Design a protein with these regions (language model features):
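Catalytic micro-motifs at enzyme active sites that drive phosphoryl/nucleotidyl and oxygen chemistry
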Residues: 90-93, 109-116, 120-126
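Short amphipathic alpha-helical patches
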Residues: 49-53, 126, 148-149
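A structured, charge-rich N-terminal accessory region that forms the first stable segment of a protein
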Residues: 1-99, 104, 111
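Short, flexible loop/turn elements at secondary-structure junctions
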Residues: 107-110, 129, 143, 147
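Short, cysteine/histidine-rich loop/knuckle motifs that typically chelate Zn2+
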Residues: 104-108, 124-127, 138, 156
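Solvent-exposed, non-transmembrane amphipathic alpha-helical segments
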Residues: 93, 123-127, 145, 156-159
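Short metal-coordination and nucleic-acid-contact micro-motifs, chiefly zinc-binding Cys/His arrays
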Residues: 96-102, 118-121, 129-133, 150-153
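Domain-exit/linker segments immediately C-terminal to small folded modules
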Residues: 134-171
Length: 171
């Protein structure tokens, strides 16, 4: 352990969900009461990564995270670097950062955004055989980035994400 590691603050621990996207995880981590970090940049500053965490929250991964970046983040969030790597797109997979996609049926079971939904070729939830949503089923507002899913609902009409499953179409 070097000198920088000894003075670097450790954040309150937030357990990652299975299949969770890095954007959703970083948003939950920042909002966790023990952390209360106002921005992605503030998290990046603590981890010694600067603005790169802001790109990750917006689902921009070009260039793909390096092992050193993952290890730097792992030091402050107490999550193994290999586990963090699972929250990013697999090497060779093309990700489409917009529109943000959601399977409301999955979200009702586990309230998190899954990285697999953002894969370019992914149009349906394999688990539920439902078409992925790209906007609110009530007001048609596009979904914000997963890091900003604070209330688990549409920020415009307040329909809970989980309730959108009723209007999600079979694929």
């Amino acid at each position: 352990m070097n000198e920088d590691d000894e003075i670097r603050p450790k954040l309150g621990y937030v357990e990652p969900y299975e299949g969770e996207s890095i954007s959703h995880y970083l948003g939950r981590l920042r909002r966790f009461k023990a952390n209360s970090l106002p921005s992605a940049y503030s998290l990046g500053k603590i981890a010694g990564l600067g603005a790169v965490t802001g790109r990750w929250e917006k689902l921009y991964f070009n260039p793909h995270p390096t092992q050193q970046e993952l290890e730097a983040l792992a030091l402050v969030v107490a999550v193994n670097a290999d586990r963090l790597a699972e929250m990013f797109p697999s090497t060779g997979m093309t990700l489409k950062p917009r529109p943000i996609k959601l399977c409301a049926a999955c979200y009702a079971e586990v309230p998190c955004h899954r990285i697999e939904w953002q894969y370019k070729e992914q149009q349906k939830c394999v688990r539920h055989n439902l078409r992925l949503l790209t906007k609110c089923t009530n007001c048609e507002t596009p979904f914000p980035i997963p890091a900003d899913w604070v209330q688990r609902e549409c920020p415009h009409c307040f329909l809970p994400f989980a309730k959108m499953a009723k209007r999600q179409q079979r694929y």
